[in-house]
UniProtKB/Swiss-Prot annotation:
Keyword Zinc listed: no
Compartment annotation: Cytoplasm
Positions of the UniProt region annotated as Domain II: 86-129
Pfam families referenced in this protein's UniProt entry, alphabetically: Bac_DnaA, Bac_DnaA_C, DnaA_N
Comment block on domains: Domain I is involved in oligomerization and binding regulators, domain II is flexibile and of varying length in different bacteria, domain III forms the AAA+ region, while domain IV binds dsDNA.
Annotated region (Domain III, AAA+ region), positions in chain: 130-346
Gene Ontology CC annotation, any one: plasma membrane
GO molecular function: ATP binding; ATP hydrolysis activity; DNA replication origin binding; lipid binding
Record's protein name: Chromosomal replication initiator protein DnaA
Region listing for Domain IV, binds dsDNA, in residue ranges: 347-466
Residues that hold ATP according to the record: G174, G176, K177, T178
Keywords on record: ATP-binding, Cytoplasm, DNA replication, DNA-binding, Lipid-binding, Nucleotide-binding
Length: 466
């Protein structure tokens, strides 16, 4: 039995799984083959349980394919394989991009560290954590739209500076990126109370750099940011067109990565789509793991409302939560704001929270939402996105270049409007409701299988909800 068996499995899994899933769950595994047993070592219990639950059948199937009746037994363990073994020689196209193409700045010895905003500075800087203790993994509502992002963030909290460095989270406004940043910070400090974890908005980094330049304290600024254990920066897209800030962050990024210090970044778009940011930075943003957070699906929106109501000791009937979630779809922040308004109105008036009461309390918000998202608007937006004509969406043409956008538009109409399936079908050239149902199921399936379709859906949701 060849020691290349696990390499063969890696190559096949890389072809079969979405890139994000492969990077997050399969790449960190180490393997040891002995006595007809293939031992897979996971970095922690969380990864072990996830792999065993989600990918056990995939791996066993590949072992049977490659070995037949001689397939080894699988064994999962937490930790690393014995150092005497040399099995983990990954397939070349599985290896993460090399990070040695650019000269990196020299690290400052610990004895020389100092705080940048006090001159003369103390020997050891005072770190402004800025991590919000209220945002934890426990009160982050998980759903299909954010499951991978939460899992990746949890991994980083348990193993900072490890495989997912940097971690880049992207998605629209109000979807939970900032919550996860704080949750990671809290997780790291819970495991290591003395960890130097710094959270900030990207604009604060720029402001601190400007202040350091004004005070002739740029070296202290560098030492401060390059000596943290974890740097969590929100909305990195605000570095756009700030050349000096990008230059300084470029060297800070290199220094932190060289020291195995964790970097987590968030943005409202995929790294390569950030305009005004240097290519060398955008390339580095993708060195670790990049994960999208999508707008929450209906079930997650309902769960968010129920959890928020419970935190406020408010009894929210399920049908009321469903009514709100069905009509407000863009992001978590909008949902929570709507619920806060409902709760405030109920407290002021002493009335029970019913669907009629919610319809009255949120009448302007609901009217605006219905006005913004119409089937006509969806058709126009989808046609422009795919560079086809609206008439094509309504036609009987079945070529993939037309059929797929038509299915996407139908799925968006079901997701973003309150129209019934027959009404949606009628708006798309008089199609039957079963055609609409098939389109919705097809797009849901493709979102699981195709990164491009998933990105298209997210981009269109963002455009239509903005």
């Amino acid at each position: 039995m060849s020691l290349s068996l696990w390499q063969q499995c890696l190559a096949r899994l890389q072809d079969e799984l979405p890139a994000t899933e492969f990077s997050m769950w399969i790449r960190p595994l180490q393997a040891e083959l002995s006595d007809n047993t293939l031992a897979l070592y996971a970095p922690n219990r969380f990864v072990l349980d996830w792999v065993r639950d989600k990918y056990l059948n995939n791996i066993n199937g590949l072992l049977n394919t490659f070995c037949g009746a001689d397939a080894p037994q699988l064994r999962f363990e937490v930790g690393t394989k014995p150092v005497t073994q040399t099995l983990k020689t990954p397939v070349h196209n599985v290896v993460a991009p090399t990070q040695t193409t650019t000269a990196q700045p020299q690290r400052v010895a610990p004895a020389a560290r100092s705080g940048w905003d006090n001159v003369p500075a103390p020997a050891e800087p005072t770190y402004r954590s800025n991590v919000n203790v209220k945002h934890t993994f426990d009160n982050f509502v998980e759903g299909k739209s954010n499951q991978l992002a939460r899992a990746a963030a949890r991994q980083v909290a348990d193993n900072p500076g490890g495989a997912y460095n940097p971690l880049f989270l992207y998605g629209g406004t109000g979807l939970g990126k900032t919550h996860l940043l704080h949750a990671v910070g809290n997780g790291i400090m819970a495991r290591k109370p003395n960890a130097k974890v710094v959270y900030m908005h990207s604009e604060r980094f720029v402001q601190d750099m400007v202040k350091a330049l004004q005070n002739n304290a740029i070296e202290e600024f560098k030492r401060y940011y390059r000596s943290v254990d974890a740097l969590l920066i929100d909305d990195i897209q605000f570095f756009a067109n700030k050349e000096r800030s990008q230059e300084e962050f470029f060297h800070t990024f290199n220094a932190l990565l060289e020291g195995n210090q964790q970097i987590i970044l968030t943005s409202d778009r995929y790294p390569k789509e950030i305009n005004g940011v240097e290519d060398r930075l955008k390339s580095r943003f993708g060195w670790g793991l990049t994960v999208a957070i999508e707008p929450p699906e209906l079930e997650t929106r309902v769960a968010i409302l129920m959890k928020k109501a419970d935190e406020n000791d408010i009894r929210l009937p399920g049908e009321v939560a469903f009514f709100i979630a069905k009509r407000l779809r863009s992001n978590v922040r909008e949902l929570e704001g709507a619920l806060n308004r409902v709760i405030a109105n109920a407290n002021f008036t002493g009335r029970a929270i019913t669907i009629d009461f919610v319809r009255e309390a949120l009448r302007d918000l609901l009217a605006l939402q219905e006005k913004l998202v119409t089937i006509d608007n969806i058709q126009k937006t989808v046609a422009e996105y795919y560079k086809i004509k609206i008439a094509d969406l309504l036609s009987k043409r079945r070529s993939r270049s037309v059929a797929r956008p038509r299915q996407m538009a139908m799925a968006l109409a079901k997701e973003l409007t309150n129209h019934s399936l027959p009404e949606i079908g009628d708006a798309f050239g008089g199609r039957d409701h079963t055609t609409v149902l098939h389109a919705c199921r097809k797009i849901e399936q493709l979102r699981e299988e195709s990164h491009d379709i998933k990105e298209d859906f997210s981009n269109l949701i963002r455009t239509l909800s903005s």
